[in-house]
A protein has these predicted regions:
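Beta1-alpha1 glycine-rich phosphate/pyrophosphate-binding loop at the start
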Residues: 2-73, 152-198
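A Rossmann-like FAD-binding core segment of flavoenzymes
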Residues: 32-34, 71-83, 97, 169-282, ...
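C-terminal auxiliary extensions adjacent to catalytic cores
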Residues: 361-401
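Internal hydrophobic alpha-helix adjacent to the cofactor/substrate pocket in enzyme cavities
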Residues: 170, 317-347
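Short, electropositive alpha-helical surface patch
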Residues: 155-172, 312-322, 352-363
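Glycine-rich, N-terminal phosphate-binding loop of Rossmann-like dinucleotide-binding domains
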Residues: 94, 106-107, 248, 261-262, ...
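FAD-binding core/adjacent interface of flavoenzyme oxidoreductases
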Residues: 2-8, 73-176, 258
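FAD-site-proximal beta/loop scaffold in flavoenzymes
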Residues: 118-142, 235, 251-321, 332
Length: 401
C-alpha cells in the first residue's frame, strides 16, 4: 500500500477511540487516521446513573472529541449519510471520503417509536441530557408509582436497567419526600440479563426482592396511555402519570415512567448491504471483519452470535477490546504485514461490567462469552471495592481522549 494511507473510523465511542489510539501507535505518521462522529462530545454510559442520582454533573462524565487531535488523529464532526463498503467510500455531509481501511463503530441509535404514546411521557437515561432531566424529575417527584420498562432487547449494557432501578430506589428511599412510593420493573426478557445465565439472573432478582422492587418478566410493552402523550416527541421534564399497556392486554399504572429505549443501527447503514436480517452488522467473531475486504465493524452496531442462541452484549468493555484487536488487523493491511514488535490482538469475548447496588457498593459481573456450550458468567457479591473499580474504569476511559 502507498506510503500515505487513510484509515477512516466512524464513531468515537469506546470501540472507535480504542481503535484510533491503538492504530496511531502502530502506524508511522504519514498514515492518516480520520475519526468521524456526528457528536461534538461523548459521554460515559456507565456514568449516566451517577448523573440521574445527582452524584456527578454531566461535564464530569463527558469528553469533547476535538481533543483527540492531540494524539495525532484527525477529527471531523459531521453526519455520515451513506457508505459504499465495496469501494470503501463514505458520504459525509455531502462530501465523498475514500478510505484505504474502514472501521465502523457508529454505535446504536435510540428510539421510542416502537412504543406508541411514549413521547412526552416516558423518561430515559441512555442519553446524557435525558439522564439529567430524569434526575430533576426525581428531585421533584411527590410520590406514587415509579415504573421502569424495557421496550425491546437488545440494548446497551444489560446491567444498566437493573443498576438504575436499584439506585433510583435508594435515592427515593433517602429523600425527605415522597412520603410513599413503589418501584416496578417490566421487561419482555425472561429474566434479568438473560445472556448471563440463570444463576446471575436469580442473584439480580434477589437484589430486587430485598428492596421490595416488583419485577415482571416476559411482559412486552405495546402502548403508553396518558393525556400528556405528544406526537412531536418533546421529552418530559417532570413526572407524568398514565398507564403502560402490555402485550397480554393488562395495564400497569404509573406516576413516573422510565423506559429503556429500543436500539437500532444508524440510518446510513440501511442501504449499505452490511446489515443482516436481524438489523445489525454481522462480523467474524475473532477479527471483527465484515464480509467486505478492508471493512471492520465493532461495538453496539454488530451482532455476534453466542453458543446457546444469545448474542454478545452491547457493552463498552467489549467494544474497547474489539477496537484494540481491529487496530492490529488494519495495521497489517496498511503495512502489508503485522507491525514489527507488536503482538496481534484477537478478540476473545472475555470481559465484565459493574452493577451498582447502592450503599456505596457494586457487584462485578464477568465472564467468558465465547465459552463452547454457553457463556460462563459470574456475579460477584456487592462490595465497596467493586465501586472503586468502576470509578477507576471511568478515569481510564477519560484518558483515551
Amino acid at each position: 500500500m502507498s506510503a500515505a494511507s487513510t484509515t477512516v473510523i466512524v464513531g468515537a465511542g469506546f470501540g472507535g477511540i480504542a481503535a484510533a489510539r491503538t492504530l496511531r501507535a502502530l502506524l508511522p505518521a504519514p498514515h492518516r487516521i480520520l475519526v468521524v462522529d456526528w457528536r461534538p462530545e461523548v459521554s460515559l454510559g456507565a456514568g449516566h446513573t451517577w448523573v440521574l442520582t445527582g452524584r456527578k454533573r454531566p461535564e464530569q462524565v463527558s469528553q469533547r472529541l476535538s481533543t483527540i487531535t492531540r494524539h495525532g488523529l484527525e477529527f471531523r464532526c459531521a453526519e455520515v449519510v451513506g457508505v459504499d463498503p465495496e469501494r470503501m467510500v463514505l458520504e459525509v455531509a455531502g462530501d465523498k471520503v475514500k478510505a484505504d481501511a474502514l472501521v465502523l463503530s457508529p454505535g446504536a441509535r435510540l428510539t421510542m417509536e416502537p412504543l406508541p404514546g411514549a413521547a412526552g411521557v416516558a423518561h430515559q437515561f441512555y442519553d446524557l441530557d435525558a439522564a439529567l432531566r430524569l434526575g430533576n424529575a426525581l428531585d421533584e417527584f411527590k410520590g406514587g408509582r415509579v415504573l421502569m420498562a424495557v421496550i425491546a432487547p437488545p440494548y446497551k449494557c444489560p446491567a444498566a436497567p437493573h443498576e438504575a432501578a436499584l439506585l433510583i430506589h435508594e435515592r427515593l428511599s433517602r429523600k425527605p419526600g415522597p412520603e410513599r412510593f413503589s418501584l416496578s420493573f417490566v421487561t419482555p426478557e425472561p429474566q434479568p440479563m438473560p445472556v448471563a445465565g440463570a444463576t446471575v439472573g436469580a442473584a439480580v432478582r434477589e437484589l430486587y426482592e430485598q428492596r421490595g422492587i416488583t419485577a415482571r418478566f416476559g411482559g412486552k410493552p405495546v402502548r403508553v396511555h396518558s393525556p400528556s402523550s405528544t406526537p412531536a416527541g418533546s421529552p418530559p421534564s417532570r413526572a407524568v402519570a398514565g398507564e403502560l399497556e402490555l402485550g397480554d392486554g393488562t395495564r400497569e399504572p404509573f406516576d413516573l415512567l422510565i423506559v429503556i429505549p429500543a436500539h437500532t443501527a444508524p440510518a446510513f447503514l440501511r442501504e449499505s448491504g452490511l446489515l443482516s436480517g436481524n438489523g445489525w452488522v454481522s462480523v467474524s467473531r475473532d477479527t471483527l471483519a465484515t464480509s467486505f475486504e478492508g471493512v471492520w465493524a465493532i461495538g453496539d452496531v454488530t451482532h455476534i452470535p453466542l453458543a446457546g442462541g444469545g448474542m454478545l452484549p452491547k457493552a463498552g468493555v467489549f467494544a474497547r477490546a474489539a477496537g484494540e484487536g481491529v487496530a492490529h488487523g488494519v495495521a497489517a493491511r496498511i503495512l502489508g504485514a503485522p507491525p514489527a514488535g507488536s503482538t496481534p490482538a484477537r478478540f476473545d469475548g472475555k470481559g465484565g461490567c459493574y452493577l451498582e447496588t447502592g450503599k456505596g457498593e457494586a457487584a462485578y459481573v464477568e465472564g467468558d462469552f465465547f465459552a463452547e456450550s454457553a457463556p460462563s458468567v459470574i456475579l460477584h457479591a456487592p462490595a465497596r471495592t467493586a465501586l472503586q473499580g468502576k470509578e477507576k474504569f471511568a478515569k481510564e476511559w477519560a484518558r483515551w481522549y
